[in-house]
């Protein structure tokens, strides 16, 4: 979501908006995004909004995205919290993953294991 604005030209940026959360029908994958940023021309950036699921936190939790970072044009940008991708499958149906290759759940969903930082696109 979009951040709110300060009360004057040198005011602080408003808080970030809430993240988006959605459950994909018929799938074992649930995605929750982080909150939006607070943006203003001068002054401090706003704090992050609540992540998907309504939980205000710096990083993602189970089924919840983290809050977004504050941002403005003068002082350094604060990093936003992480969104999360949660993959669920029955505990009596073990999955294995070897060499970075995708595994496939019984319902056909692909389970991909990856490590790193920055921006990822999973499709």
Specify the residue positions occupied by each region the protein language model found.
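Low-complexity, glycine/proline-biased repetitive segments and flexible coils/loops
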Residues: 1-123
